[in-house]
């Protein structure tokens, strides 16, 4: 039986003129945004890749340079058309998006058994540092242009029975949003733990451990003001909200009309600076919680953040995408230059749509 092609993630360029999609057919595709201002008139079947290349093995994790653009006018910066890709039994590698050539391989070898450690999560920050997460809750930090890690640590806490001590994701910020303090970054694990990574310190600090039936953290999203953290878990029908100053206690939850199953297509949530938090559904629609709600953690103005009562907040809006109820809308990401425009994946197909349209 032929395996269905599924989009694993979408990354916009910083200027909104192009975007990259990564698929489970080992392919990495780059798209140009058409010049037509009214995308409703576009034939979505004609949205074809500008460039594409394929690896000879599956892609476990990947991340794009935050300054990625096809039109880099600043020649003093390192080229921004870069993507880092992690796979099994292979080192983490840096590729050029334009020609698909491998530029650099990072040292991810386990010195004890001589095997390459699988990088399950990766992130490039604005200071060209590459963060990697692997098994046994290990985090390493690399300079993007050097193969050897400049910082490495792992948590000594053991996961509970049946849980995986794997760093599954790093914190995601809205494009164009406020930068975090230097060196401070959250990461999550499949054992439902949250850690703080800070290369100024010599250890990985566990800030949160949730005893829940959920199957592990898959996304950590930050509000534009940086005060609230939104945590997406597998086998869950809600997105947890935390105050960044107190990650031990759940503040509120965003209620989902479906459960994020362990073996389902990758349904990803996304926060942008204009429309708040959006997420696709298995029925092909897009759920949205507005910016005002997201920026205040779902706490009404007359309530205190110390109020112990947790509120389950339903979506404020649900948009139709004309995909049909049998086609999931898996990845939804807004264009940084035009927030009403978003790239949407449905199966292995990518289309451009406008909110509310």
Swiss-Prot record:
Any one cellular-component term (Gene Ontology)? nucleus
Q: What is its main location?
A: nucleus
Keyword list (alphabetical) reads: mRNA processing, mRNA splicing, Nucleus
UniProt-annotated location(s): Nucleus
Per the UniProt entry, what are the Gene Ontology biological process annotations, in alphabetical order?
mRNA processing; RNA splicing
Q: Which domain of life is it from?
A: Eukaryota
Q: Which InterPro entries match?
A: SWT21/TCAB1_mRNA_Telomere, WD40/YVTN_repeat-like_dom_sf, WD40_repeat_dom_sf
**What function does the entry list?**
Involved in mRNA splicing. Helps to stabilize the U1 snRNP-5' splice site interaction.
Protein family membership: Belongs to the SWT21 family.
* Assembly and interaction partners: Associates with snRNPs.
* Name of the protein this chain belongs to: Protein SWT21
Q: Which species is listed as the source? A: Saccharomyces cerevisiae (strain Lalvin EC1118 / Prise de mousse)
State the organism's lineage.
Answer: Eukaryota, Fungi, Dikarya, Ascomycota, Saccharomycotina
């Amino acid at each position: 039986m032929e395996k269905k092609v599924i989009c694993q993630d979408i990354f916009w360029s910083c200027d909104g003129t192009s975007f990259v999609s990564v698929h489970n057919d080992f392919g990495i595709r780059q798209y140009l945004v058409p010049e037509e201002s009214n995308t409703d008139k576009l034939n979505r079947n004609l949205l074809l890749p500008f460039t594409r290349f394929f690896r000879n093995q599956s892609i476990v994790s990947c991340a794009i340079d935050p300054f990625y653009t096809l039109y880099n006018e600043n020649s003093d910066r390192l080229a921004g058309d870069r993507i880092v890709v992690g796979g099994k039994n292979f080192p983490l590698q840096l590729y050029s998006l334009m020609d698909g050539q491998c530029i650099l391989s990072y040292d991810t070898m386990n010195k004890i058994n001589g095997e390459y450690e699988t990088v399950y999560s990766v992130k490039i920050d604005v200071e060209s540092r590459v963060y990697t997460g692997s098994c046994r809750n290990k985090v390493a930090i690399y300079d993007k242009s050097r193969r050897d890690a400049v910082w490495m640590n792992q948590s000594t806490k053991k996961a509970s029975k049946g849980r995986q001590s794997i760093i599954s994701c790093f914190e995601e910020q809205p494009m164009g949003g406020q930068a975090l303090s230097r060196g401070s970054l959250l990461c999550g694990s499949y054992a439902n733990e949250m850690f703080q990574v800070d290369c100024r310190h010599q250890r990985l600090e566990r800030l949160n451990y949730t005893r829940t039936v959920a199957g592990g953290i898959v996304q950590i999203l930050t509000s534009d003001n940086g005060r609230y953290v939104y945590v997406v878990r597998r086998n869950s029908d809600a997105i947890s909200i935390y105050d960044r100053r107190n990650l031990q206690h759940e503040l509120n939850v965003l209620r989902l009309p479906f459960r994020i199953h362990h073996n389902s297509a990758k349904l990803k949530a996304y926060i942008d600076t204009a429309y708040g938090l959006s997420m696709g559904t298995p029925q092909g629609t897009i759920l949205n919680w507005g910016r005002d709600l997201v920026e205040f953690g779902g706490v009404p103005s007359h309530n205190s953040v110390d109020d112990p009562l947790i509120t389950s907040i339903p979506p404020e809006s649900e948009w139709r995408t004309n995909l049909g109820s049998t086609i999931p809308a898996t990845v939804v990401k807004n264009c940084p230059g035009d927030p009403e425009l978003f790239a949407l994946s449905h199966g292995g197909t990518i289309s451009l749509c406008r909110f509310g349209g």
